[in-house]
């Protein structure tokens, strides 16, 4: 599958994680997730300052076909959210790994990154 960037980490619930350094990561949903959802029409993001455990609900994505929860792929405190998605949720369809990012986390334990899937393992998940 060509839409799985090798420089990111992933979880089976279709979120991606980009290591920004200094214990900060950017989180979004994968190309596969947005493809399954179809045209995204609404996004609910977590609150800045919210502390999320791995697997916690961190938002909602609604499309013309379905609604889906977004989960925290790793434990951390929400530092920033992509407020542009509130007025332009379709950005996730157009650029899920770039301008369509959801939120940034300050990790509780940066070593937790080792438990995430690499691109090859995620490709097997969605295979």
From Swiss-Prot:
UniProt domain Lipoyl-binding: residue ranges: 24-106
Classification via Pfam families: GCV_H (PF01597)
NCBIfam families (alphabetical): gcvH, PRK01202.1
Origin superkingdom: Bacteria
Any one annotated GO CC term: glycine cleavage complex
Listed SUPFAM superfamilies: Single hybrid motif (SSF51230)
GO biological processes: glycine decarboxylation via glycine cleavage system
UniProt cofactor note: Binds 1 lipoyl cofactor covalently.
InterPro entries: 2-oxoA_DH_lipoyl-BS, Biotin_lipoyl, GCV_H, GCV_H/Fam206, GCV_H_sub, Single_hybrid_motif
Quaternary organization: The glycine cleavage system is composed of four proteins: P, T, L and H.
Keyword Transport annotated: no
Function: The glycine cleavage system catalyzes the degradation of glycine. The H protein shuttles the methylamine group of glycine from the P protein to the T protein.
Cofactor: (R)-lipoate
Name of the protein in question: Glycine cleavage system H protein
PTM-bearing positions, type N6-lipoyllysine: 65
Sequence similarity: Belongs to the GcvH family.
Record key words, sorted: Lipoyl
């Amino acid at each position: 599958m060509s839409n799985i960037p090798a420089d990111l980490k992933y979880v089976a619930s279709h979120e991606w994680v980009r290591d920004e350094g200094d214990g900060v990561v950017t989180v979004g949903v994968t190309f596969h997730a947005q493809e399954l959802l179809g045209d995204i029409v609404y996004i609910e993001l977590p609150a800045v300052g919210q502390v999320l455990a791995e697997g916690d609900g961190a938002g909602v994505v609604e499309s013309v076909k379905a609604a889906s929860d977004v989960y925290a792929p790793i434990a951390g405190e929400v530092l920033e959210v992509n407020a542009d998605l509130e007025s332009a949720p379709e950005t996730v369809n157009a650029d899920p790994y770039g301008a369509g990012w959801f939120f940034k986390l300050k990790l509780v334990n940066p070593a937790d990154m080792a438990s995430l899937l690499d691109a090859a393992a995620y490709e097997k998940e969605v295979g």
